[in-house]
Amino acid sequence: MLMLLALLSCAGKAGAQTVAVKSDLLTGGMLASPNLGVELKLSERFTLEAGVYYNPFPAGGDKRWKHWFVQPELRYWMCQPYGGHFFGTGLMYGVYNVAKARLPFGLFKGVRSERYEGDFTGVGISYGYHFILSPRWGLETSISVGFLHTRYERYRCAQCGEKTGSGNRNFIAPTKASISLVYMMQ
């Protein structure tokens, strides 16, 4: 029994890494996307963060704003992980089903009268700042810009299944703007 306790105490020290759990309040509110992120300290300057966003809910009326996407990101911290400035590079992949919505930057202008369904992939760079509120809590702001590629099918209306076209698009755009509440697990 004593040997087991000794092994467990060593394993805890050897494998101890700082982990943060977070929720992006800005994207959650703007896109009505429940989300959860996890960030793992890799070294004295690097962390790996991954966020999952999911909205299965109808938007009301003929509107449709269903989607899910993941956004992993490798971050370099200027001072220490989970405190101050950071730069990152990340990937993203997701699936969407959007109709009767206004999308920013002139993306899919036809989405106001037609439904678009497809997937997207992307790569981007980011900058952010983590405010330490207490030993366990933090507030993080981040903005990313990147290259996105999407393949889509276009339908005449939000509910009907009559396909009117398909295609793909490439564009450079903001890929993330976040204000996240962060909880540190140690």
Question: What do the PLM-derived regions correspond to, one by one?
Answer:
Residues M1-S9:
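Bacterial N-terminal signal peptides
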Residues C10-A16:
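Sec/Tat signal peptide C-region and signal peptidase I cleavage site
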Residues A16-L25, T89, T175:
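Transmembrane beta-strand segments of Gram-negative outer membrane beta-barrel proteins
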Residues T18-V21, P56, G106-S113, C160-S166:
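Extracytoplasmic loops and strand-loop junctions of Gram-negative outer membrane beta-barrel proteins
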Residues T27-T47:
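N-terminal targeting signals for Sec/Tat export/insertion, comprising classic cleavable signal peptides
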Residues M30, G51, F57-W65, A158-R169:
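Surface-exposed strand-loop-strand hairpins of Gram-negative outer-membrane beta-barrel proteins
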Residues L40-T141, S178-Y183:
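Gram-negative (and chloroplast) outer-membrane scaffold detector with strong preference
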Residues S134-Q186:
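Predominantly the C-terminal beta-signal and adjacent terminal strand-loop region
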